[in-house]
Amino acid sequence: QAVHQREFGISKGLFWSPAGSALAFYRMDESMVTDYPIVNIDARCAKAEPVKYPMAGMKSHEVTVGVYNLSTGETVWLETGTPKEKFLTNIAWSPDEKSIYIAELNREQDEMNLVRYSALTGKKEAVLFTETNKHYVEPQYPVLFLPNDSGKFIWQSQKDGYNHLYLYDTTGKQLKQLTQGEWVVTQVIGFDAKGENLFITSTQPHIRSSFNYGTPMNVNGWKLNLKKGETSLLTPNAALESVHNLSVSASGKYAIDSYDAPKIPRIINLIRTKDGKEIKNLLTAKDPYKGYVLPEI
């Protein structure tokens, strides 16, 4: 089950290893958490039903992570230690299935440690790095290993004030900041077949846009070269301020580009990732407001 109120990127409770030989999972103990009444209005006669909710300053639930081995039928519990109320977030497996990476956040939510555990013994292997902020630290995404180099991974972080991508090795050394600027990476989509480029969407401004700053009203698809740290625009209609969503083919050669805006009905195109060229229009939705006089702000 999902834990920690589904915060910090947590949306599930089961995590298969890359080859499917083991299953990591959350276990949550709420016995120490006070009940909080919630009115159930689904029934004809509404009634109060208690839920477990940790109020500020009171006991929170305790979470542990287990690893079930399919071949032996045995479960190993990761030795995450104390304090037991810390948040265990963004679980990820190493490509060789020997280690598990967890972003551990303290109850105050101002310090995060990226920790590596042995999936075989449950022992803590290393604290790779720590992120702190006097206001708030919010890990949202697990480590993403490079497909052609299992000794390196990409980490998403807001440590400079904007959500950007960083390249680390498995010792915890930051090799480079892959993206930077006063804009945010909104989605990491995947790698090309050779693992040389990463496809993302972001609010990065560009020369075709009337914006010279990052804005959530203008999200485009980009190809990020991991070696050079350079981005190239993928979405051919980027001059139109709109929000793009990409779905990249397994080969990484093509992508489905879907976008719309308050004044642009849904448009879906097949594009070539080599140069962002539009190959074919798949859908151009009709304008539902055509013929109406719309109010202006």
Regions found by a protein language model. Name each.
Residues A2-P18, N90-A92, P139-G151:
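Signature of short aromatic-glycine-proline-rich micro-motifs recurring in repeat-based ectodomains
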Residues V39-Y53, M58-E62, R107-K123:
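Carboxylate/His-rich catalytic cores and anion/metal-binding grooves
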Residues A126, H164-Q180:
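Polyanionic (Asp/Glu-rich) segments that form extended negatively charged tracts
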Residues F8-P37, E49-G73:
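Extended catalytic-interface subdomain
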